Amino acid sequence: MRNWRWLLLVLAVLLAWLQYRFWFGPGNSGEVMMLEAQVAHQTQDNEGLRQRNQALAAEVKDLKDGEAAIEERARSELGMIKPGETFYRVVEDAPLPAPASAEASAPAQQAPEPVDPVDHP
């Protein structure tokens, strides 16, 4: 009977020691959770960089293979045109400022200016 008590005591101490190492020792559960979060964050970063690399690789391939991409870039970034083409720049008018009150939005009636019938040299 006494042997059982010693065995039970040894098992309880062993369990307590293992629990202490699990919660507070090196490689404890808090560190594991922190490392898992870092791995998830790094995985997201890697996926974004992988997509960026694929887009850059596609752009490089297009620039190497296709003349259309080179032409589009020369037109948009360098302002180049083909021989015989005419370049037109469309400039939009700036919007008029909104009137300050409702009275200002009503059309003002002005008398026409008198016409001078005398011919000036």
UniProtKB/Swiss-Prot annotation:
Residues 98-121 are annotated as: Disordered. Residues 1-6 are cytoplasmic. The keyword Membrane applies. Residues 25-121 are periplasmic. It is found in: Cell inner membrane. Residues 31-66 form a coiled coil. Residues 99-113 have a biased composition (Low complexity). The chain crosses the membrane at residues 7-24. One of its GO terms (biological process) is FtsZ-dependent cytokinesis. Keywords: Cell cycle, Cell division, Cell inner membrane, Cell membrane, Coiled coil, Membrane, Transmembrane, Transmembrane helix. It is a single-pass type II membrane protein. Essential cell division protein. May link together the upstream cell division proteins, which are predominantly cytoplasmic, with the downstream cell division proteins, which are predominantly periplasmic. Part of a complex composed of FtsB, FtsL and FtsQ. This is Cell division protein FtsB. The gene is ftsB.
